[in-house]
Amino acid sequence: KLKNSILEIKEKETDCNIVYSFNRLNNYCGKWIRHCGLYPDKKIRIWNRNIGMWEGKIHETIKFSKETKEVRLHGDLLHYSFNTHEDFRNQSFRFAEMKGESYFSKGKKNASLLKIISPMFFFIKNYFLKLGFLDGKDGFRICLVYAQATKHKYDTLKRLYNCQSKQHK
């Protein structure tokens, strides 16, 4: 379905200020994940390269140089993300560490309360409110790793502030 949507836009002459998005369906250890906050995993991935570029260390956002109009394409991009739970956990923690470093470089303060509340909130939101339990044991494992990675992000931020304060003594 997505392939046909892309072929349709290629055949048409389109406005260069239009950006195209679609849903990404993630595969975790051989299983399609439709909950846990991972679906629909909307991504903008098609745009005129003269009006936009990636910004951030881990492709966090796309920055457009002018006003754009987003058009949603039909179909899912099948994303074979992780073959093993360990791969998933390692990448989640690597991205969390990068996010903690980003917070530090932007001067975000280390809030001890956030370190406690955010992981719990993240788990509750994704496992219960976003129906992660419907993905069974895998849904539980995914939500648990994301909660742990959220804590790791704040641990990284705290570690960086501790290192900074030791250097200033």
Question: Where are the language model's segments positioned?
Answer:
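Catalytic-site signature of metal-activated, phosphate-bearing donor transferases
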Residues: 1-164
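N-proximal low-complexity "stem/linker" segments adjacent to membrane-targeting elements
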Residues: 166-169
